[in-house]
Amino acid sequence: MSKSLAGLAVLAALFIAVDAFRPSGLTNGHATFYGGSDASGTMGGACGYGDLYSAGYGTMTAALSTALFNDGASCGECYRITCDHAADSRWCLKGASVVITATNFCPPNFALPNNNGGWCNPPLKHFDMAQPAWEKIGIYRGGIVPVVFQRVSCYKKGGVRFRINGRDYFELVNIQNVGGAGSIKSVSIKGSKTGWLAMSRNWGANWQSNAYLDGQALSFSITTTDGATRVFLNVVPSSWSFGQIYSSNVQF
């Protein structure tokens, strides 16, 4: 095989094609906001992304209610949220919509009724949005507005990122800045001295391996929830250390 054909074969192995992510239908819900005018209170969160600025999410984010969060499997998904002006002309900005990324969980509050403070109680479909995102669709004093939403494709700048946490025999990898479907179905990891090893979701967007991979270059194979797969060969160098973030040039 010629070098050019071999190169094409490697490239094809990195991208397993599926149909482009297709937006969902429209669904009704409600939205509130949190985190302050600069969204500083939204950092961290139940997906484990940490600093949402450095992770690529900025202020266009939201915490999802139980009905949407799916025990963390929805981390990274993108939603277009439109304020339902027909249902609330007082507090909705007419025709306004915004695309957010799911980065956190809005826990239920069973001490309060669903229609008066228990906004994130099951089975409600609710977005607790970063304040800057919410103010693109609603008037601040309204506090809560009815919305129409749909899941849409995520468009991210740069490649997928990997933050390596944990300790020896326990690699906890937070996978960030995922485009396309945004949410992840499965992950495998490969050290330069191992074969491919399946990882398991620990919590949020954190995936774990119990292999000893110190001193090895790390590769990942990620399949998103729409079935698209990308392979990130040697994206983490053998000199890696816990607590560091490593960026790829590959995106969905």
UniProtKB/Swiss-Prot annotation:
The gene is EXPA11. SUPFAM superfamilies: Barwin-like endoglucanases (SSF50685), PHL pollen allergen (SSF49590). Causes loosening and extension of plant cell walls by disrupting non-covalent bonding between cellulose microfibrils and matrix glucans. No enzymatic activity has been found. SMART domains: DPBB_1 (SM00837). This is Expansin-A11. Residues 1-20 form the signal peptide. It comes from the Eukaryota. Residues 169-248 form the Expansin-like CBD domain. Expressed in the leaf, but not in the epidermis or in the vascular bundles. It is a peripheral membrane protein. One of its GO terms (biological process) is anatomical structure morphogenesis. GO terms for cellular component: extracellular region; membrane. Keywords: Cell wall, Cell wall biogenesis/degradation, Membrane, Secreted, Signal. Gene3D superfamilies: Expansin, cellulose-binding-like domain, RlpA-like domain. Belongs to the expansin family. Expansin A subfamily. It is found in: Secreted, Cell wall; Membrane. PANTHER family: EXPANSIN-A15. Residues 44-159 form the Expansin-like EG45 domain. Pfam families: DPBB_1, Expansin_C. It comes from Arabidopsis thaliana (Mouse-ear cress).
